[in-house]
Regions:
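Amphipathic alpha-helical segments of tetratricopeptide repeats
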Residues: 20, 70-74, 120, 174, ...
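Extended ligand-binding clefts on enzyme/binding-domain cores
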Residues: 131-132, 142-266, 271-283, 295-343, ...
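CBM-like carbohydrate-recognition segments
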Residues: 2-46, 51-91, 97-110, 114, ...
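Surface loop/turn signatures of beta-propeller and other carbohydrate-active proteins
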Residues: 9-17, 75, 124-127, 185-187, ...
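Asp-box/WD-like beta-propeller blade repeats and closely related beta-sheet repeat scaffolds
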Residues: 105-139
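Short, composition-biased motifs enriched in small/polar/acidic residues
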Residues: 372-450
């Protein structure tokens, strides 16, 4: 297992390479073709940025993210009635930034209005017709579903976000296309869209299955990000978890010996070679699953370590030149294995932000997993002023001091400590604690130590 200091160092190195190139986070000119800074690629980057901030608490990182949201006045790319799932990606990060400072309800206005317009029935189920939409949209619904309505009175109505979220998920998973969805319940992998339900022509000219790596990464990471905030008693939590666990097993089986995953999970000879963005998604999701006790550390920890080493050693540039911190092997935007080829150690993707965000997400979970003897977790507030803490002990110990940290407005903290008895001399055991009578909003984390 890489030490925490090295994991964090690699994350900071990669992020600094990006922020040095783009010091103004909200500008439109810092994206190809003058795209607005609320585009999904930049939103995905900030998913990882906030993951980095949660573990190093660097104010400059937080301020960089706030500047990004402030520039468009916390709006979505195409307005409050926008029907594109992609554009809800920015809203996910607005919600998280609100959770860091719950006095700033303006950060919620546009994403709440947008999701409300969906829930009211103005947006049909066919908006989720490509697997990317799960990642861009699903966590936004989940995050809104657990916010305290009293805190954002006047914004959130009585809409039930979780049931509507499931309606979209069920549609794309089990209905859309040929009436059985984009998810293959036998292979436990996803077709990116209906164009790939039939075998397609691979790069060697043969007809093969196409399970696009990053497309499956979108779904896998989205399930983790969704379950991370949903209460476990959510009506459909069990299905999300089962899908996640089935995918994990399928993904583990097709990892390359070098730790990467191919661009096509269904056929290794289709544009063979390493690819970073899908690898980062899978590494993130599996590490999250181990951290929360949903995946066996014995089974999946080697896969996670190999995935991270592929990214941090095989893809991340460590040099004395301008490329120091550049992440290689990243496929450009697209929808299939052929897009952005050739993908190499030095190839520059058309957007340099989203792959980095996924790398930072993976690092944020591996950092928690690498802690000894326990791990540090982010834990969202559930209903009734409770927070649920799930963690897996990595090393053998008999008890741990659990420190609950509330992170709200920057610079404030509230702590409480309790000692929990743990299974004697057994590593890899998962625990769940529920803490009650806490502040109704905010983000919490648990730190276990001897």
């Amino acid at each position: 297992m890489p030490p925490q200091a090295q994991i964090l160092s690699d994350m900071v190195l990669a992020n600094n390479h990006f922020t040095n190139e783009w010091p103004v986070p909200g500008c439109s000119s810092c994206l190809p073709g003058a795209h607005p800074s609320t585009i999904w690629t930049r939103a995905t980057y900030f998913e990882g940025v906030l993951g980095l901030y949660r573990i190093n608490h660097d104010p400059s990182i937080y301020n960089y993210a706030v500047q990004w949201g402030t520039f468009p006045n916390w709006s979505l790319r195409n307005g409050d009635t926008d029907t594109s799932p992609d554009d809800q990606g920015a809203g996910q990060e607005y919600i998280e930034l609100y959770q860091f400072d719950t006095t700033q309800t303006n950060r919620l206005t546009h994403i709440v209005n947008n999701v409300n317009s969906w829930v009211k029935g103005n947006v049909g189920l066919k908006q989720w017709t490509y697997v990317d939409s799960i990642h861009m949209s699903m966590p936004a619904f989940a995050k809104l579903s657990v916010l305290d309505s009293n805190v954002i009175s006047g914004l959130k109505t009585n809409y039930t976000y979780s049931p509507q979220m499931y309606s979209y998920f069920h549609f794309i998973k089990s209905v859309y296309g040929r009436s059985n969805g984009l998810y293959n319940a036998t292979d436990h992998l996803w077709c990116r869209d209906t164009n790939f339900l039939s075998n397609y022509t691979a790069s060697d000219g043969t007809k093969q299955k196409c399970y696009w790596s990053r497309g499956n990464g979108w779904a896998f990471a989205a399930l983790a990000r969704t379950m991370d905030v949903l209460p476990t008693n959510d009506l459909h939590y069990a299905e999300y978890l089962q899908t996640f666990q089935d995918m994990a097993a399928a993904l583990k089986a097709v990892q390359r010996p070098d730790g990467f995953w191919n661009v096509n999970l269904g056929y290794t000879n289709d544009y063979p070679g390493p690819e970073s963005s899908g690898t980062a998604c899978f590494t993130y999701g599996m590490a999250w699953g181990i951290n929360h006790g949903y995946l066996s550390s014995t089974t999946y920890l080697p896969t996670v370590i190999n995935g991270w080493n592929a990214l941090a050693i095989g893809a991340l540039h460590h040099s004395s030149g301008a490329d120091n911190g550049f992440l290689g092997y990243e496929q450009s935007t697209g929808s299939k294995p052929s897009d952005g080829q050739p993908v190499t150690y030095t190839s520059v993707p058309n957007f340099d932000d989203f792959g980095l965000g996924l790398f930072l997400l993976a690092g944020s979970q591996l950092y928690q997993l690498s802690a000894s003897p326990g791990i540090t977790l982010a834990a969202p507030v559930l209903t009734d002023n409770q927070v649920q803490l799930n963690f897996t002990v990595i090393s053998s110990l008999t008890n741990a001091t659990l420190e609950l940290l509330q992170t709200g407005q920057l610079g404030t903290a509230w702590t409480t400590n309790t000692t929990a008895a743990l299974t004697t001399n057994v590593a890899g055991i998962s625990y769940c604690y529920t803490v009650t009578n806490i502040a109704p909003t905010g983000f919490y984390r648990i730190q276990s130590s001897p």
